């Protein structure tokens, strides 16, 4: 288990992380979300042992993070962090040695992963000669080269085409099923919802939401209703508790403040007749995020 307990980090007088706590269990994919500057990168660096917390503790399987423990951690950064003048093989040996892997172990694992991703022919090519998408593949391969207990993924699908996104998704699920703890951070909320049963949203270094996604959605009172019926927009906007109506080509999306408004909306719609659709949906994670941090996550 990864345990982050009451962690605070100052840079001088600036508090980058403020009393942050969460756990990631074996085989769990945990979402850590926040806008740029929220404190995610600082948190990742503390988990990696690159920075020491000013206050609090971080442990992996009960051991305080140190150089020995970080051998069991893999990290895919949002930014390219490859040494572009090295070949893929040289880069893998360099990275694997940092994780105390032996050269024959590194090359065996590298050959397996290159073959799995269909890029074996790039083994002796320099990083700078590869496309951005293939560089991202290599960066991902290096992050999982040591079969990490803990894997941190920061925007893992950046620069990938849809086919390779699916390959990465399959690999992430496989790693989780094999017991890896995964911290997943992305601007793409649909990806977070796909992978993460548990998450935290941080703002200015402080947790604003933390828990299981299912529970978070249930506690978030606003809902969306999708309606197809013989009804006009103004009939819906004047219902108490309706906070927004979006008119689409053949249906209305009605936003309400809580579940109690559902029956009111249904009564009005039913009286108008010809109801072919009335579906109540939970809010998306993106809607919840926007309500908490005040801006779109993907902007």
Regions found by a protein language model. Give the residues of each.
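ABC transporter nucleotide-binding domains
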Residues: 2, 9-203, 209
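ABC-family P-loop ATPase nucleotide-binding domain
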Residues: 1-8, 295-299
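Active-site phosphate/pyrophosphate- and oxyanion-stabilizing loops and adjacent acidic/basic residues
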Residues: 93, 190, 214, 267, ...
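Residues that scaffold the ATP/ADP-binding catalytic core of kinase and kinase-like folds
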Residues: 68, 216, 288, 292
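Structural motif detector for alpha-helix initiation sites
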Residues: 88, 213, 282-285
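Short, charged/small-residue-rich alpha-helical element at the C-terminal edge
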Residues: 223-298
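A broad structural signal for alpha-helix termini and local helix breaks/kinks
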Residues: 11, 99-100, 117, 220, ...
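ABC transporter nucleotide-binding domain
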Residues: 170-255
């Amino acid at each position: 288990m990864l345990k982050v307990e009451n962690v605070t980090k100052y840079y001088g007088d600036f508090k980058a992380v403020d009393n942050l706590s969460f756990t990631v269990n074996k085989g769990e994919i945990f979402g850590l979300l926040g806008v740029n500057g929220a404190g995610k990168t600082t948190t990742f660096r503390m988990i990696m042992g690159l920075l020491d917390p000013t206050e609090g503790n971080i442990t992996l399987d009960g051991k305080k993070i140190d150089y020995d423990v970080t051998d069991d951690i893999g990290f895919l950064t949002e930014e390219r962090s490859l040494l572009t003048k090295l070949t893929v093989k040289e880069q893998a040996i360099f990275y694997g040695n940092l994780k105390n892997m032996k050269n024959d172990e590194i090359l065996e694992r590298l050959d397996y992963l290159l073959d799995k991703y269909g890029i074996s022919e790039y083994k002796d090519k320099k990083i700078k000669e590869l496309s951005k998408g293939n560089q991202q593949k290599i960066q991902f391969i290096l992050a999982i080269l040591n079969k990490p207990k803990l894997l941190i993924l920061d925007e893992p699908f950046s620069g990938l085409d849809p086919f390779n996104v699916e390959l990465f998704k399959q690999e992430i699920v496989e790693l989780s099923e094999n017991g890896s703890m995964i911290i997943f951070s992305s601007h793409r909320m649909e990806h977070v919802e796909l992978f993460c049963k548990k998450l935290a949203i941080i703002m200015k270094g402080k947790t604003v939401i933390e828990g299981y996604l299912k529970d978070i959605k249930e506690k978030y009172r606003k809902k969306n209703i999708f309606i197809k019926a013989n009804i006009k927009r103004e009939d819906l906007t004047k219902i108490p508790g309706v906070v927004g109506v979006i008119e689409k080509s053949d249906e209305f999306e009605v936003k309400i403040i809580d579940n109690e408004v559902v029956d009111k909306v249904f009564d009005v719609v039913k009286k108008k007749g010809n109801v072919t659709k009335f579906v109540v949906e939970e809010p998306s994670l993106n809607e919840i995020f926007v309500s908490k941090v005040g801006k779109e996550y993907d902007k």
